Regions:
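Gly/Ser/Thr/Pro-rich low-complexity, intrinsically disordered segments
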Residues: 1-291
Length: 291
């Protein structure tokens, strides 16, 4: 359960840097660990920054203008990979019950929570939950792909590391089950595409999800280092500010210097919850129920 006294607000970058220094002194953040938060970024001063720091978790949320887009950002460092979890409605794969992200966050006492992939709404990709393979469909999709390999899938292992299975890669069910066992995969997310892999920017002409060539509200999650993560949305927060194609969003993630990054469901689904409150502006100014 989070410590209420560990939450705080900051109104300038210096205050956040002091919190980061405290996390370094406690050895939660390594002395040489490069942080995404940057005091030289074009921070939106009118919006408070929120942070959390205890002996096992650091998180900070802020908003900045990057390449003329308003980005809502969250950087997280945890001491143990088990602190990063996937929450399904009723903790049951396939549950028909839907809830708001704020409700799911409250059920798990989450410091930070984000929406992922609306897994019950689509049949594409590979779904793993609690080390068990639930979805691997070999039916033909568009005549070129199978449903399981029609998109990129993000798989997260017990060490908290990101692993990818890519669109078009041919695998059998047995291959995937062996991969899950060999890499101790805890769960997967099936949306995508991969935005950054091993520090390399990824760009696309076509992808079956996310209307990638349209200006759209975007959301993505990244791994920066060991148990070090970053989440960002680009939303319709100001009528004068454009949103992103997927290639533009990938470029924004790449500018942050992350190791791996993966697109999550955007639009009204793209949501960042900190300490029980929605931090970014959601499309239509209303949460969407998810599974």
């Amino acid at each position: 359960v989070p410590d209420p006294a560990a939450f705080g607000e900051a109104y300038n970058a210096g205050q956040v840097l002091e919190v980061i220094d405290s996390a370094r002194e406690s050895l939660l953040i390594g002395q040489n660990e490069r942080m995404i938060f940057n005091e030289n970024a074009d921070l939106i001063a009118a919006v408070p920054m929120y942070y959390y720091l205890d002996e096992s978790l650091f998180a900070v949320c802020w908003k900045e203008v990057l390449e003329d887009r308003i980005c809502s950002c969250c950087e997280i460092v945890v001491s143990d990979a088990s602190q990063m979890r996937r929450k399904l409605s009723q903790d049951t794969y396939g549950s028909p019950v839907k809830a708001y992200a704020t409700e799911l966050a409250a059920q798990t006492n989450a410091v930070v929570a984000v929406n992922a992939d609306l897994y019950l709404q689509r049949d594409l990709g590979i779904t793993v939950y609690n080390r068990q393979l639930y979805r691997f469909n070999e039916w033909i999709y568009t005549g070129r792909y199978n449903q399981y390999n029609a998109i990129d899938t993000l798989l997260i292992d017990s060490a908290g590391n990101f692993n990818f299975m890519h669109m078009g890669e041919q695998r059998s069910r047995e291959d995937v089950e062996r991969y899950i066992e060999d890499h101790d995969i805890l769960y997967s997310i099936a949306f995508g595409p991969v935005l950054v892999e091993n520090g390399e920017l990824q760009q696309y002409d076509w992808y079956p999800l996310g209307e990638i060539n349209e200006e759209y509200s975007r959301a993505g999650i990244a791994q920066c280092g060991e148990r070090h993560y970053f989440y960002m949305t680009v939303s319709f927060e100001d009528s004068r500010i454009p949103r992103c194609t997927i290639n533009e969003f990938a470029q924004l993630m790449h500018l942050k210097g992350v190791k791996h990054a993966y697109a999550l469901d955007g639009g009204q689904t793209g949501e960042l919850v900190f300490n029980g409150q929605v931090y970014n502006r959601i499309d239509f100014d209303a949460e969407r129920t998810v599974s």
